[in-house]
Amino acid sequence: MHQLVLLRHGESVWNKENLFTGWTDVELSPSGEEESRKAGLLLKEHGFVFDMAFTSLLKRAIKTLWIVLEQMDLMWIPERKEWRLNERHYGALQGLNKAQTAEQYGDEQVKLWRRSYKVRPPALAEGDRRHPSFDPRYHSLQGELLPSTECLQDTVERVLPFWRQQAVPALRQGKRILIAAHGNSLRGLIKYLDQVSDEDIVGLEIPTGSPLVYELDSDLKPMRHYYLETGKTG
């Protein structure tokens, strides 16, 4: 059996303020830090140990991982930061209040941008300073890889090369893996692992700071998955 744990980062300050976040690099809120500590303690209490960890290039996920590993006394294990695990890019919506955006564009349009599998929000202009091309952490990436906006389908397609090239080889080596990432990048992994339909994946809710445990067979197919605190199937 292979062990994989997925963890959405703790609440961020923009989660708390109901703002579109995407690739904006915001901090964890105090509640998010506490969620991360509780997740680490929960994993430790249940006897989980990891051989390596993956996270995104965004500090709300990075700090979640660090807090969890500190609680587990596992800060020494290898960790890799992968841009493909970043949150979905919300384009020109990033930084806007979700309720105010709905008032401006209408509930149905905003619902399409947020929850449709294939509809992208308005894109950032290339000259917009929020565009990832201005961020030094992405300077090594070719321009065509950097999104100015994404739908969920784009995010899924971005995440899958990480799964195949990074996670699968590590799991096949017998490594126990923790992935601390974001709601939509984790949706991409869950969609692939559980063969969730395009229609159903958009409605899948992933709570912040709650470890989702996968037990995988020799072919890396899920035998069982559950949220740790309740044992409830995901």
From Swiss-Prot:
Keywords: Gluconeogenesis, Glycolysis, Isomerase. This is 2,3-bisphosphoglycerate-dependent phosphoglycerate mutase. Catalyzes the interconversion of 2-phosphoglycerate and 3-phosphoglycerate. Homodimer. Pathway: Carbohydrate degradation; glycolysis; pyruvate from D-glyceraldehyde 3-phosphate: step 3/5. The record marks H182 as: Transition state stabilizer. Belongs to the phosphoglycerate mutase family. BPG-dependent PGAM subfamily. The keyword Isomerase applies. The lineage of its organism: Bacteria, Pseudomonadati, Thermodesulfobacteriota, Desulfuromonadia, Geobacterales. The gene is gpmA. It catalyses: (2R)-2-phosphoglycerate = (2R)-3-phosphoglycerate.
